[in-house]
Amino acid sequence: MMPFSVLQVKRLQLELITPAKPTLQETKFLSDIDDQEGLRFQVPVIMCYKDNPSLNKNCNPVKVIREALSRALVYYYPLAGRLKEGPNRKLMVDCNGEGILFVEASADVTLEQLGDKILPPCPLLEEFLFNFPGSDGIIGCPLLLVQVTCLTCGGFILALRVNHTMCDAPGLLLFLTAIAEMARGAHAPSILPVWERELLFSRDPPRITCVHHEYEDVIDHSDGSYASSNQSNMVQRSFYFGAKEMRVLRKQIPPHVISTCSTFDLITACLSKCRTLALKINPKQAVRVSCVVNARGKHHNVRLPLRYYGNAFAFPTAVSKAEPLCKNPLGYALELVKKAKATMNEEYLRSVADLLVLRGRPQYSSTGSYLIVSDNTRAGFGDVNFGWGQPVFAGPAKALDLISFYVQHKNNTEDGILVPMCLPSSAMERFQQELERITQEPKEDICNNLRSTRIMSMM
């Protein structure tokens, strides 16, 4: 395929999309999980679609999605409002129907020419999701920005940015599914959303009943190379975990342990160890890795409606000194991850809400020795069909400082998991070297395989 030299994206005037029908004018409180400091940011998501004339001949994706957005906002009308802050930093949404931001764009490039540049960390994100001045705040700003960019091949890219205080990944998926159903001609969403944020208010009186390492004040004893405030120092790359990498990692774990661990657990243990080595963290420093655990469903005993689209998760945290994490076999890190995840239940989530209220809605720990991982491989973004079939890729567009998202990705002929990482430039090369070392097949195994691949970094 012919590569493109300079991408030219033409944008039309920014619009405000309002609900298609009048909606309630009211004020709704966010939950005490929603409005914590650590969720007061915007999350970028990118979704890429091929042309599919057999399904949607002569249809304009911009027109279809614009109209579907407006109709879906009738049911998700709080997203068309604006946040305001009350006493004790309590967030609430003014459901005033002002609307979400929408922009139509076109680019002189095909999806094939873009290739891996649509994958996280998407180097063209600023072109496909332009940051309009003043649009990325938390209080008093639009809660959603959507840009639909039509490509010369007939395909298109839908990129969006959502205020994380309003919804998590499953909640956003409910909204996107509603838009997709409307785009395909439905009169109403198949799943009608519920607000009910009071279900995750703090208790009266609030009481902290669990240990929450994720919100502890931490003194950073590292060499200072990880300075998240200095974004010029940070670089992003994505790393692919396919069948070969997972096979090598599993061989390093005792049989009685591997039988009860998930792919997520194993990758998280691997990343935690390699990242700690790459950052050269002080051996006596406590290292933390938090796993975002969804509270929905029967597994964690949290009674929430399936139609709930607010934030319904916690990040239980594994803690270890850097020295044993680096020196012990991979199984040590794996056991830490499994034990941390096992602490998640309804009591844990209630205790988080109470802690946040009692301590003024604090930020989670933000030192370089801390990593947050979120499994989006089953979030369902790849099933969102606006009438052009399933997306070529759909998911978070990049890592966010300390946060890495696991996304499903097909590399050549196999399905695997892509993990974007954000690290200081000085540590990124060491991280890749450690990752290649820990996922390298022993020589005797390589001889037994016709083909061997290594960890792939995607710039």
UniProtKB/Swiss-Prot annotation:
Q: Is Transferase included in the keywords of this UniProt record?
A: yes
Miscellaneous remark of the record: The fruit of cv. Royal Gala exhibits a high ester accumulation, whereas the cv. Granny Smith contains low ester levels; this influences strongly the ripe apple fruit aroma.
- Mind telling me what this protein is named? Alcohol acyl transferase 1 allele RGc
Q: Which gene encodes it?
A: AAT1RGC
Share an example GO biological-process annotation for this protein: fruit ripening, climacteric
List the InterPro entries: CAT-like_dom_sf, Plant_acyltransferase
Summarize the protein's role. Involved in the biosynthesis of volatile esters which confer ripe apple fruit flavor. Alcohol acyl transferase that can use a wide range of alcohols as substrate to produce esters.
Q: The organism's lineage?
A: Eukaryota, Viridiplantae, Streptophyta, Embryophyta, Tracheophyta
| GO molecular function terms listed in the Swiss-Prot or TrEMBL record | acyltransferase activity
Q: Which UniProt keywords apply?
A: Transferase
Tell me what organism the protein belongs to: Malus domestica (Apple)
Please state which protein family the record places this protein in. Answer: Belongs to the plant acyltransferase family.
- Assigned EC number: 2.3.1.-
Which top-level enzyme class is recorded in the Swiss-Prot or TrEMBL entry? transferase
Give the tissue specificity. Answer: Expressed at very low levels in the skin of ripe fruit.
Concerning PANTHER family, the annotation shows: ACYL TRANSFERASE 4, OS05G0315700 PROTEIN
